[in-house]
Structure formats: structure tokens, C-alpha cells
Amino acid sequence: MNQEIMNLFNPTTPAQVFDQIRISIASPEKILSWSYGEIKKPETINYRTFKPERDGLFCARIFGPIKDYECLCGKYKRMKYKGIICEKCSVEVTLSRVRRERMGHIELAAPVAHIWFLKSLPSRIGLLLDMTLKDLERILYFEYYVVLEPGLTALKDRQLLSEDEYLKAQDEYGQDSFTAMIGAEAIRELLRGLELEKLEQTLRAEMQETDSDIKHKKLAKRLKIVEAFRHSGNKPEWMIMTVVPVIPPDLRPLVPLDGGRFATSDLNDLYRRVINRNNRLKRLMELRAPDIIIRNEKRMLQEAVDALFDNGRRGRVITGANKRPLKSLADMLKGKQGRFRQNLLGKRVDYSGRSVIVVGPELRLHQCGLPKKMALELFKPFIYSRLDAKGLSTTVKQAKKLVEKERPEVWDILDEVIREHPVLLNRAPTLHRLGIQAFEPVLIEGKAIQLHPLVCSAFNADFDGDQMAVHVPLSLEAQLEARVLMMSTNNILHPANGQPIIVPSQDIVLGLYYVSIMREGMPGQGMTFGNMAELEHALHAKAIHLHSKIKYRWEGMNEEGKIAKRWIETTAGRVMLGNLLPKHPRVTFEVINKLMTKREISGVIDQVYRHCGQKETVIFCDRIMALGFYNAFKAGISFGKDDMVVPAGKWKIVDTTRTLAKDFEQQYNDGLITHGEKYNKVVDAWSKASEEIAKEMMKEISVTKKTATGADADINSIYMMSHSGARGSPAQMRQLAGMRGLMAKPSGEIIETPIISNFKEGLSVLEYFNSTHGARKGLADTALKTANSGYLTRRLVDVAQDCIITQDDCGTHLGIKMRAIVDAGTLVASLGSRILGRVPCDDVRDPATNAVLVKAGTLMEESHIDAIQQAGVQEVKIRSALTCELVNGICKMCYGRDLARGTPVNHGEAVGVIAAQSIGEPGTQLTMRTFHIGGAAQLNEQSFVESNFEGKVVIRNKAIARNSEGHLIAMVRNMVVTIVDPDGTERATHRIQYGSRMHVDDGDMIKRGQRIAEWDPYTRPILTEAEGTIGFEDLTEGLSISETLDESTGIAKRVVIDWRGTRGGADLRPAIVIKGKDGKVLKLARGGDARYMLSVDAILSVDIGATVKPGDILARISTESAKTRDITGGLPRVAELFEARKPKDAAIIAEIAGTIRFGRDYKNKRRISIEPVDKTEEAREYLIPKGKHIHLQDGDIVEKGDFIVEGNPAPHDILAIKGIEELAAYLVNEIQEVYRLQGVLINDKHIEVIVRQMLQKIEVTDQGDTDMIAGEQVDKIEFDALNAKAQEEGKKPASGNPVLLGITKASLQTRSFFSAASFQETTRVLTEAAVNGKIDPLEGLKENVIVGRLIPAGTGASMARIREVALKRDKLILDEREKQAAIVPSQPEPQPLALPPAE
């Protein structure tokens, strides 16, 4: 201890070294051991002398001197008296800094409950004592007595008595016959009387006996807290305080303002209240005041202490003089302004500045322009030291003067200092790691920072007044990291998807597009040129045009690396572009011998990077930027009013659509269609019309016109801008020259009347008014979106922050299967794009020859992917973060390629944070609205399956019938069509919908692109399996069925209506039956009668007495009604998936494979059970609300995981029924869907990393012989450790299932309480951690930032690994010594110790 105290005064001593931090409840003895003295008076400082009052809140005797090495009365001054205590004022002569470290205490006259343990839910005191919070408060706030010892009276233990009852009982039983107390003393006695070991045994026994689920949960909660107290060494009575610690005075300062007033920290006010009330209570006790007065004073003391610890948690908030709530100790930690987030996780730093940015087109990619004034200020200390070294100044003062006068030699020295000293530029908001990059500064005049145009997209910067901050890395290590890791030239690829991020945009794209245009009939067409000089000469002489078709002799490089010449047909502009390409055999002229749009340019940069490396790419990018800017300026592209071409056929389309809309209106008025249908149809018609007009306009704009000479005319400027990807989109062009189209209301509904005019024609007043509606919502949305997206990113970072690459290989054989994603016949994501940069679990083989294409454990590069795709491999099983078996972090093999570098991932890479940033950063581009689907949006519903391969058709679970029309119809739900190669390899499998019309049969040969089956996506059929005549049951006109005549077609259709509401209809069970010749209901082959139950809204397709064949449709249920549901899209959907929330109308999923049986209806629910195929399992039963449509019939066979009721599946159900792999596939696909819609590319592995973090907990199903409690959620690591221990001791291990936690919940339940407390719900997290005596092993990033260390990632990880190796080696040596020591006694003479050599 003395050493520590001595270290306090030596500012150079290293900080205490520690590996972990433990938090627990402080006992009164502990608080006293921290304290340097008791505070007895509420006074702070004397207002005349400004000296602290003795024994007050700022007392110098307790907390230390105010001035360094000077006692209060001034008797002892200076260093020589260090450590002496002045006999006059009792102040120790030492540094005033101790006033930040020394604590005091207040001895309370009556015990007080700690509000965190009382009120923070669940109440810890309440759980331990098994009392409700209400009762506890009644005792604590002196309303009721509690019986501690009933003695021989009729009172019960822990019975509550009001004042009157207490007095009555005393009269009745006599004063000493029982003990009852009131207030915190009573609770303290109760807590002290708990025998935890006994209590634990009782609770475990009760849990074994109880059958009620609720009771079991309650007991488990209590048991958990009892165990926590037993194992942590905390005593329950410590939750009641007798001593309050007082924090050091310099952490709650009192600052004199001018005018004799003081500014003070709120804590001083709160402490003052506590001291005042405490002193008053002491005095009242000495005076033997009446009980009621003392009791009131005790209650007030309790309230004062409550307010000090957590103001406003109970009762009303205590406010200061200006009606502002006082900030208590808890508020100091909580929220964005609290200690954690404001000071520990984010700090303001020196050596930084900020200024407006302007474009710097003449900079190189690794440079930024730094204003001289800023540089001078930022590098001041460096300049001083250099001035001193050169002998230009002898003192700092002198150097300061030189710099202030800005002498010429200072500028020379600044140049020297800045050379090769990178600076960091940061643009807020820093949404991903590319928001901070390092550049070499170039000194410039002026006051604005110059930024290279190509890095703008990484910073998301533009030059409309954006500001950026500059930071100077000081130490050599920091400079090294800035240069090697953060230099803009080292960040060419986007960490989210591995695409180049240094991509030209806007003017540069337009210039490059213009250069690469080829036009027919330009001057000099067909001329040939041998080299660049000839070409430039001809261009200057205007003999040829930039766009003329010419022949050119191109010097490329062949595979051997030698120069190879060949003739190519191209244009002069493209040759200029081609000359910038680096020479490489793989990068040919064909790469740029086409029209360069933004996408093409990105592709070229990608190719150059993959083949020629980083340095060449950077040089190439700088060059094409210069070329692009120059040509954009030379081309002089601008646009006028006539460039917006209104298509000729516009009004014709508008008129037809108008008549259509009128027809729909008329049909609605005649009652043929509902309002909803009319709305959908009208909206549909108008959106089709505006699409058509847009097509027409694009056609007219994009066609190249001819001039009088027969040459191609200039391309339309607007089309050039949009087509090149420089600015504007077809949607914007449509509004300029087509028609503006439909507008949305703020609710997201679409207004039926469209805006027919475009901006060129101008809008009418009504149209303008309609359009303001949606536009205003758009702006409001953007503001909300930014906040929501930021919050999502914060939650993601928090859940994944401790996910780091820690080892090379975890050696697992598990993985997840990847296949191409196909939607409605179009390829959404190819297999290659999904497995690039991943590691296969097993050898990837050619399906035709069975040759190994990629060995297991190889990182798949582009070359491997080409081979895999050519061989036509359908599915590859790859290693994934989800299946990685490491305890801490993820291994290199399971992660694969580091997307930002294109190489295998490095040790210590913080992949969790990268994943969080990659998912969160595009969040601002996602939409916020929920789409109301109806009309146009459902036309892309998939309604057929076609084959992507040639081969033979094999049908599993076959059940096909030929219906009356002679078509083949699929009769079961689990039929699978497989396409097989001639040599028997499966190439593709398709699940066929029930009621589909089959185009192929078992054993047919099929061609690529041929349809296998098709179905009507808008209805669900009910098919007959038997041949016979139709009979109706319980189908009574007006009661359970109603007939409507469709006037437009003249056909009557009969619809089943809700029969339950009608009189006498409650017991009806409407159905269609198939009767045989004898008029009896037929029996089906699979068991049961040929009776088909009908649900509400089913439309009948047959009449009584009609004959039907198997496969004929008896009735259909329109899914149209289900389709116009709101689909949550954009950000809310992503958040919903990551939070693992249960969707509103969740699907019901079959938990086992089996046969459907309809049971007896239960109230207003239908009962369905599944008879399992596997007889060892028990049947499952589901209750389904009657309004929901069940598309299954009695006797249908379902597979495990099939939907019984349609809807969005709840992720928890998928995990429970189908397992982790299916869940991962579902989450990845659903999240990717949202991002794909916005055109954002994110690699699957990022989502997998987050999902891994969501699956860290296991729910114990059977505790075995371990200490775990059934139903509790345990960390995977803890679960495995406890099980391993149990197995070692020969006990029965526990079993459990993985649980899926939402990201917020997962963050709050991490192993590190520091990380959780700094995230959300700080008080709750800290309370729980303290009760459990939790230890934070400081493994993640956040915890280490909080305690002020290097993070264990990146360069900080290597230090951690070195330490680990050293510890292992030490352990080996110690073990060896112990072994030797054990052997020694049995031998006669002592042997020298043999030590292994140090590594």
C-alpha cells in the first residue's frame, strides 16, 4: 500500500499493470478503508477567505492541500517539508493532485437501502427476500412494520403490520413477545438472517417438485441471485448502507465566478442535503425526540441518499435553485453525455484542426493540401525542436517569437518537418473506416484544405461547404501505422465488398465517356496510324476528330512479357486512354476499347489492381483522372431546354390510360369491383403509362441523329450525362421530359391522380400542390433516416466489437452450403460471387469428371472461381464465421479473404467492427418506408420453374394426376424435380408447388431454358384426388355461401362466406365431397374420406353433380387479399432482422415431418395436428385463428420446416426447427434482399459475423449434474467449460439449445460488463455485475479503450500474442520445476535441475 501511495506523488511511475477488473458491492469496511476522514459539516468554502472549511465537503485536512506543497495556514511551504503534517491546520504537505484521488465518507445515523439494488429491475433485495417491491418500499419508507420473530404469537414471519396493527399486537401479546421492526434496519436484519446455502438447497428441491412453468421461472430467478451472492463473496446486508463514500473534491469542483457567486457541481448540493439530514437525525436521536419525528427524518435521509445515487429513480426529481434536475452519480455515467460515452470512449485530442475542404485536382492520390497557417500551428513543437537543433533559437520562448513573427527560416523548417510526416484527415460522420485516411501534406496558400477528388466517395464528401478535421500522428509508431495501414493509396478497395472505391465520378466519368465515343462518318474515318505522335499531329491539324473510327498499331505485351504489336480498330480518344494502361499481358486494349461508363471504368480499375498491383493502380487512377477532367473541360458538355425531348406519342398514351381509368371508375360505381381493386387497377394503369412514356423518351434521346453530311450528330448531352453514370438517372430524365408520374402521400399511399406534365412543360397548380406532399415527406424522412442508421451501426459495432481474428485455423469440418440465388428465373447472385475469397470445407469436384478443382482449405481466388463456374458446380460447402469453433474470435480460414486488401486476412484484424461498419454505412441509403404492395409491385411474382441445365428429369415423392383437360397436375406439396446429367450427377433440384401444371414427366429429357412447371401465383387451388361426382356439405345459400354475378363477364361465382356469425351456423363445416356411383362418399387411398374442407373466401369451381377426374380444381382461394399487405422494407426491416423480432403475422412452421390431421375446433381457433412419420416422436398440435387460411387438407403430407400457415417466419422458429445453417441462410438472404434493392453490395461474410455474435448463448434444457439451472441462458464458452468439468468428474453433463438474441440484447449480455455498461442501461448492467462479482477479462476493443490501453486488434494484437507466448513458456518452466521437485525426494543424491532453453 505504501508503495502505491509513494507512486501517487511520482508522476513518472508507470500505471498499475492489471489483466482483469472485478466489480462487486462495497462493504462498509471497504468504504472506510478508502476514506481519509469523516465529513461532518455541510459547509464547502469560506466565502471571504475562499479557504475550505474544516470537516466540510472540501476540507483540506481530509482531502489534501489546495496548493502544491503548501499547508492551509501557510506555515510549511515548498518541497523540503514534503510529507509533514502541519500541527496548526493538520494538512499534509504534498501535491494538490491528491485532491483528485482522496475520498471521504459520511457515517449515517441510520442504515439506508442502496436504490440501485432496490429499484433497478428486477429488484435484487426483493428477489433475495422473496418480497414485492411495493412491500419493501412500505417498510423502507416507514409505513409498515415487518415481523422478524413472531415468537409464540399468532403472527407470521415477515408479516406486514400497519402502525395501528402493530400497537394492537403489542397490547394483545405484550411488548417483548415478538420482534417487529421498520425501515432499512428491518430489511438489513432480514438480509443478515438469510442462510444462503440452506436457501439454495431449498430452492433446488422446490424446482424439482414444481410442475408450473411460471413458478419454475420465478424459482430459477431467485436461485440465480442466491448463487450469485454465494459465489461472489458479497454479503446481502451490504445492499443496505451504513456509510456513504464521498468522492474527491476536485471531481466535483466549486469555482468562484466574478461577483461573489460560485458555480458548483450538482453533487455538492446532493451531498449537502445528505449531511444536513444526517446531522439533524443525530441531534434528534440525542435529544430523544418522539418516534414519529425521528422516523420522518430517517425517511428524508433515505430519500436524500437515493437522490445522490440516482436522482429521479424514486419519487420526484430533486431540483436545484433554477428548477433544473440535479445530476446524480448515476447520471454522470449514463447516456451520450455520461462518463463512458463522452470521456472514455470518445475524447477530444490536441494536435488537431478543422477547415473547409476544396477540390485539389492537381494533387497525387496520396497527398492533401494543408494551409500553411494550419500546418504552422499543428507542427509547432516539431518546429521548436528543429529551430533549437539548428541553433536558431536557444530557448523555447525565443523559438515561439520566431514562429509568431513567421520568419522565412521558419517556413523552410516547416517544409522539413512536414516532409514524409503523414497527417490524418477525417470527415464526420465517420461511418466506416475509410472515413479517416492518411495523406502526405502539401503546403498551400489560403485557408481551405485541398482534397483529392478520387477519395471523395470514400469520405462521402462534396465541396458544398463540407468541413474536415486534421490530426497529426505524433509517435513514430503512429506515423508508421498511418503510412502503412491508413494511407489513401493503401485503401483502394471497399472493405464491404472488395470492389474498388477509388472510382472516378461526375466530371471525370463524363470526360472519359466523351473520349471513348465512336461516331460514324466523322472526318478522317478509316485512316491508319503507327504511333501516338502521328495521331496527336493529326488531331492538332483537325484532320481527324476525337471520335473518328481509325486503325492503330497497338503495342501490347504477350504472355512471355515481350512487346507484341497488332492492328486494332478504335478511335483517337480510346488510344489516348489506352496509353495510360499499365503494360501487362492480362490487361489488353480490349479492356478500354468500348464506351466507358462509370461501371466500365470501375471494372478496368479492378482488373488493373488484380493484375498489376497497387502501385500501378494508383498511378493509373491519377492519370485517368487528369485525362477525364481535361476532356470534360474540352468537350464543353452542357444542356439546354431542347435537349429535353418530350416523346411524340406521349399524349396518345395518356389518353388511352385516361379512358381505362374512367372504365375502372365506372365498374366501381356499378359495384363490380371493390374500392381497393379499383385503386390498384388505376395505380397500375398509370404506372404502366409513365413507364411507356419513359421508354419512348429514352428511345428518342438515345438514337443518334445524322447531320446533313451523313455523319453522326453530337449525342444528346442529357443522355450522355445519365448514360455515362456521371449525373442523373433515367428516373430524373423521365420527370424532366416524360411525365412526372404518380406521387405518394406522406403515409406512403400513392395518390390516384398522376402528374401528367413534366418539368419542361411545367406543372399546373393542382399538380404542383399534389407533388409538394411527397417531396416534403422525403426531406423529413432523410433526417430521421440518418439518426436511425447511426443507431443501427452503433448497436452492430457494440455486438461485434470483440470479434477479432485470433488464430490461423480452428480445424473445424463444419461449414455452410452456398449456391447461386435465383429469383423468378433471373440470376440475382452467382455462386462465384458468393464464394470468392472463401475457403471450401471439402474438395470441390467437377460434377462431370469428378476431378478435384479446389482442394479443401484453399483460399479461392478468381482463377478457381472461373474453373468452378465453367465446370457447372451447383453448390459449394464453405467455412464460415458462423461455424468457427474458436472460443475467442474467429480463425483465418473461416473468415477467408480480407476484402479491403484482396489477400488472406491478417492476425488481429477487427473483423467484427468491419462487418458492423459495412452493414451500417449504407444504412443512410436505404429507404425508411414500409411498402404498400398492391398493383404493379406484384407483377414480378414467380409463377414458373425453368431448367438451367440439359439432362434427364427425375421426380422424387411423385404424385401426378392427369386432369379432365389432359394436363399433368402436381398433387402433393413435397414433390421434388431433379435434373440429372447423363452420368447421373444431380445438377439442379426444384421444389414443385401444389397444383402446378407439369410440362415434363419422370424420365423425360429436358433442354436448357425449358419450363418444368407453372402455376397461377394469385390463387391456391384445392384439387380432387378421386374420380366421381360432386356433392356439397353444409354449403347453404345465404348462410355459408353467397352467389355474385360478375357483370363484365356475365358469370356467376359462388364464394364461401363467414358462416360463424350467422344464426345456426356455428357448427357448420362447409366442404365438397366426391361421391361414387352408389352415392356414398369415396374413401381415399391415403386414408380418410374424399372430403375437402373449405375456408372463408374460397371460390367454388364446380357444381353439384358434376363429374371430376383427379387433378381437377374444386375450389380456389385467392391469395390476392394476402398480397396487399404492408412489406416492411429498408432500414426498419434490417433492424427487425438483426433484433430477431417476431414478425406481426408470423408463419406457423411444421416442427416434424408427418401427416396433417384436423382436430376438433377450439373456441374460435382451428386445431391441426401432425402425425409423425417417425413413430418414436410425439404428435404436434397447433391452434390457428379461424380467419387465417390453411392451405393444407386433412391427410396431406408435410416435411419438417414446411409452412402450415403462410407469413414471415420468425427467426427463432427457423433456428429451433431447421438449425443454425438454415437460419443463417435465411437471415443473410433477407438482409441482402433489402440492400440489393438499393443496389448496395455487401459481402455475406459480414452478415455471418454479426449472426455469429447473435448465437453466443445456449438455453439449458436439462441441467444434468451441473450447477446450471434449466431454462437459463448461458454463454457457449461457460456451457462447454462446465460440461467438460462435469465429464471429468464423471457426472452427467447438461444439454441445451442455441438461442438467437437480438443485437441489443446480445450487446447487453456480453461477457464484458464494461462494454455492456457503456452501451445502454448502464445502471442495470452495473448493478447486475456488482451482485455477481463479475470479472471483466478485458478481451474486447471497447473495454480496453475504456481503461486506456491499446486495443487487442491490429498492431495491438501482436503485443498480446507475444505476452501469451511468454506466459506459456513461463508456465512450462514452472511445470518442469515442479516435476523435478516431485522426483527429487525418491533419489539418493540431489540432481541439478534441467531447464528447457528459452525460445
Curated annotation (Swiss-Prot):
Compositionally biased intervals (Pro residues): 1387-1399
Obligatory cofactor(s): Mg(2+); Zn(2+)
UniProt: Zn(2+) 1 binding residues: 71, 73, 86, 89
Transmembrane segments: none
Taxonomic path: Bacteria, Pseudomonadati, Pseudomonadota, Alphaproteobacteria, Hyphomicrobiales
Gene Ontology terms: biological process: DNA-templated transcription
Protein name as it appears in the record: DNA-directed RNA polymerase subunit beta'
Enzyme class: transferase
Catalytic reactions of this protein: RNA(n) + a ribonucleoside 5'-triphosphate = RNA(n+1) + diphosphate
The encoding gene: rpoC
SS bond list: none
